[in-house]
Swiss-Prot record:
SUPFAM superfamilies xref list: Clavaminate synthase-like
Comment on pH dependence: Optimum pH is 6.5.
Gene: F6'H2
Tissue expression summary: Low expression in roots.
Name of the protein: Feruloyl CoA ortho-hydroxylase 2
Length: 361
């Protein structure tokens, strides 16, 4: 059966129809047993990781911070230094239980293991809400080369809406994981805010830093010719903070701000990866850095990841915080409506750090 399916893909349109329009995703494509990567997934040579300086050695990677350290001042400094110098760090002993993390991974596999007809209920064409979306790649309509990834994206409005609209197969685990990370998020934002002279994370500041939450369940199936494509292309996130749960397979690479080399982020059991998003870079007037990152495709293993994007409310107007520029520091960014920024990000393909040019003065 698989060989028959694999043999039927004679044209680009047939592949696109099977993956995108019929809702099979790249998981379905991978499971047909294809041996050669379809043309529309072949990235330009300059976008393949083999064309970049890559550091796989353990002597250079993002900082690892023990959040449970009783010396809160030293933890805060480590977080802020990492936000300025790397834009990425891993946290351990962060207060989210291993059981919750493992349940989230299991639920992710469970959702993507559903029959295609079940997953398609949450596609762009069939979903009851734009807050719930099953899809593939990033922006297929805008991309010259597709990315080797399927996803379920869930924008959180309320537990009541989630109970009605989110898939049964992963709802409870996703809500629990999201709720369990909130104390960690607030602690990190408090550290980052205090370093910007924000004395208190009051309701106004909360609406800027963490007024909205989106969680994605990502699935990267085994890929033929993984060296020719990407799981996710070069980009920075548009969030304030991103909290990433990755499995043991690995594949996330971050571009070092100091050397420009791509550095592998090795999976650490029980850890969470934190990265600064564009919104935080804008609000900090460039002190904290959102950094290019990307995900490799894998020829041997299926991989999952679950990022939580903590962001301003869509209707918020964001710009450099008054606390940052009140002493005469010149603003680098203009005030922008956050929803306009997000729309700008999603209407194009991944293109490194170019999105933030939208906010430049």
């Amino acid at each position: 059966m698989n060989q028959t399916l694999a043999a039927q893909f004679l044209t680009r349109d047939q592949v696109t129809n099977f993956v995108v329009h019929e809702g099979n995703g790249v998981k379905g494509l991978s499971e047909t047993g294809i041996k050669v990567l379809p043309d529309q997934y072949i990235q330009p040579f300059e976008e393949r990781l083999i064309n970049f300086h890559v550091k796989e050695d353990s002597d250079e990677s993002i900082p690892v911070i023990d959040i449970s350290n009783l010396d809160e001042k030293s933890v805060s400094k480590a977080v802020c230094d990492a936000a300025e110098e790397w834009g990425f760090f891993q946290v351990i002993n962060h207060g989210v239980s291993m059981e919750v993390l493992e349940n989230m991974k299991t639920a992710t596999h469970r959702f993507f293991g559903l029959p295609v007809e079940e997953k398609r209920k949450f596609s762009r064409e069939k979903s009851l809400s734009t807050n719930v979306r099953f899809g593939t790649s990033f922006s297929p309509h805008a991309e010259k080369a597709l990315e080797w990834k399927d996803y379920l994206s869930l924008f959180f409005v309320s537990e009541a809406e989630a109970s009605q609209l989110w898939p049964d197969s992963c709802r409870s685990e996703t809500l629990e994981y999201m709720n369990e990370t909130k104390p960690l998020v607030k602690k990190l934002l408090r550290f980052l805010g205090e370093n910007l002279n924000v004395k208190e994370l009051d309701k106004t500041k909360e609406s800027f830093f963490m007024g909205s939450t989106r969680i994605n369940l990502n699935y990267y199936p085994i890929c033929p010719n993984p060296e020719l494509t990407v799981g996710v292309g070069r980009h920075s996130d548009v969030s304030s903070l991103t909290i990433l749960l990755q499995d043991e397979i690995g594949g996330l690479h971050v571009r070092s701000l100091t050397t420009g080399r791509w550095v592998h982020v090795p999976p650490i059991s029980g850890s969470l990866v934190i990265n600064i998003g564009d919104a935080m870079q804008i609000m900090s007037n460039g002190r904290y850095k959102s950094v290019e990152h990307r995900v490799l495709a894998n020829g041997s293993y299926n991989r999952i990841s679950v990022p939580i994007f903590v962001s301003p409310k869509p209707e918020s107007v964001i710009g450099p915080l008054l606390e940052v520029i009140e002493n005469g520091e010149k603003p680098v960014y203009k005030d922008i409506l956050y929803t306009d920024y997000v729309k700008h990000f999603f209407r194009k393909a991944h293109d490194g750090k170019k999105t933030i040019d939208f906010a430049n003065i």
